[in-house]
């Protein structure tokens, strides 16, 4: 029986839209055939996978150490090495998943997939929020480690460059915990007195004054779940977005709590925030120690806490660098230049 006939007879539809031919793999093994084939039914998706002039396939070939062949809507490798076959399947699955979720920059997708070390725990780092617009994948090894840290620890600090995903991933993981009913409330906070501005002198009511500071949280959530869902959760009180000063005197139980722009907290404010943690709570603290707006002689609460609490094994400490920046590629170069200057001055 020809392989194509076996494939047509025994193909199993993969949830991501790939026909994953496990039956064909068994047939090939029994008949000592080395070809491992994945069928991508959608021609547009296949074109994105291959890339312009098959540039993406060349990257995959270099990574696998074996040629990748295309025939119609099929991608194949000729190898009897099960680890290579599994890696090939994993890479194509990931690319197709992200394309189906709306991503079209497959060069970035492939770079992120190939740069992340494939370990059993890393494969569990995608974030699937119930009712989400798309699945969230880590783009770098550091991001994957950050997600694992949020899963393993009840308190996690992450400091890193602008655009490295520290806040977005924390918001995504918090939404997952909330919408899967593992936590009853999601609270997001940040210090609101920045760059010399004081709320009392800004125009409008309290909400008008807070919106410019808290808008990034809404932007992040609306990239993950529909805007109507965000609005409904906020109105129901399941999601609370508030300035840091509103945390004083509270005990937050069974909640997931995010403190963003933590570099702009004082030592006293950081202590106040961390001690709000109640039973069943998770706390994610994110900030960029290179962008503090505090007066020069005021120590950052983030820097102080990262040093003071680093020996407590129950607290996760993560750092993201310029290599983890996922905004415009030019941003990565800018961040790298500032990092280099800071390292030279230290």
Enumerate the language-model features and the residues they cover.
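N-terminal amphipathic/basic-hydrophobic helices that include classical n-h-c signal peptides
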Residues: 1-31
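Accessory, non-ATPase domains that flank or precede helicase/AAA+ motor cores in DNA-metabolism machines
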Residues: 24-90
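Interdomain boundary/hinge elements
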Residues: 31-41, 95-110, 316, 320
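Interdomain "pre-motor" coupling segment immediately N-terminal to P-loop NTPase/helicase cores
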Residues: 69-123
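Conserved adenine-nucleotide phosphate-binding loops and their immediately adjacent elements
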Residues: 123-135
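Conserved helicase motor core of SF1/SF2 NTP-dependent helicases
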Residues: 133-259, 263-346
């Amino acid at each position: 029986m020809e392989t194509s006939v076996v494939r047509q007879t025994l193909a199993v539809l993969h949830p991501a839209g790939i026909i994953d031919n496990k039956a064909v793999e068994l047939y090939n093994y029994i008949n000592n055939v080395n070809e491992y084939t994945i069928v991508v039914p959608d021609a547009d998706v296949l074109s994105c996978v291959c890339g312009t002039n098959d540039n993406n396939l060349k990257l995959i070939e270099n990574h696998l150490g074996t040629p990748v062949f295309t025939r119609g809507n099929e991608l194949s490798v000729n190898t009897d090495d099960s680890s290579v076959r599994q890696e090939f399947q994993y890479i194509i699955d990931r690319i197709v998943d992200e394309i189906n979720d709306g991503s079209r920059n497959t060069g970035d997708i492939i770079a992120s997939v190939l740069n992340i070390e494939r370990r059993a725990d890393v494969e569990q780092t995608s974030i699937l929020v119930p009712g989400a617009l798309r699945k969230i994948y880590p783009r770098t090894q550091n991001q994957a480690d950050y997600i694992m840290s949020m899963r393993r620890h009840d308190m996690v600090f992450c400091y890193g460059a602008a655009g490295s995903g520290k806040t977005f991933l924390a918001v995504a993981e918090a939404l997952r915990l909330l919408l899967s009913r593992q936590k009853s409330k999601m609270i997001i906070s940040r210090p609101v007195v920045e760059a010399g501005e004081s709320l009392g002198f800004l125009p409008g009511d309290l909400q008008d004054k807070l919106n410019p500071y808290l808008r990034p949280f809404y932007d992040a959530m609306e990239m993950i779940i529909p805007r109507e869902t965000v609005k409904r959760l906020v109105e129901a009180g399941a999601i609370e977005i508030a300035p840091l000063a509103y945390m004083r005197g509270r005990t937050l139980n069974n909640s997931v709590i995010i403190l963003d722009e933590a570099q702009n907290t004082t030592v006293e404010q950081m202590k106040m925030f961390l001690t709000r943690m109640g039973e069943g709570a998770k706390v994610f603290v994110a900030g960029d120690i290179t962008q503090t707006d505090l007066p020069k002689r005021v120590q950052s609460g983030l820097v102080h806490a990262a040093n003071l609490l680093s020996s407590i094994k129950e607290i996760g400490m993560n750092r993201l660098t310029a290599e983890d920046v996922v905004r415009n590629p030019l941003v990565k170069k800018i961040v790298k230049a500032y990092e280099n200057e800071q390292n030279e001055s230290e």
